[in-house]
């Protein structure tokens, strides 16, 4: 088909699986995928998975070694920022969902995959099985939920799981709003995967 695609594999790293870091990196290189990503494991706000984020630091040398296994064909990428954050975001307001909504396999539209569970039904924006996504996006429910997540009534450090996919957007927007690091227009080449699905 001669399509321009990028192939990657991911490892969701829990401390008890540290012995799998190097084999994972070697597998990515052996398969010849474009990248192998090693990222932290998100836990919910109750710590249901029991992830001990303090133990990630003990794996830094292994993660460095894994990155060095990459070559010109396969990049081994460690999501250092999230791993080093030890499960706690620097922000309390959750601004990221306005830029990166998530949709479940059932069609449920929510601000984050962390909110797909029925216990978060008040944060369910709609379901595109029943209505057009455009209508969901323009709905009062959308804005009510987005405004709530960005308000002092919501605390991202205690009221949701750890470091969701919207983490980087929320961090950048929080620093911009606080004036600690302003978001600047990009002048470089557009990044790959701007329309990642």
Q: What do these predicted ranges mean?
A:
Residues 1-131:
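Radical SAM enzyme [4Fe-4S]-AdoMet core and its adjacent flexible, acidic
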Residues 114-197:
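Flexible mid-to-C-terminal extensions adjoining Fe-S/redox cofactors in radical SAM and related proteins
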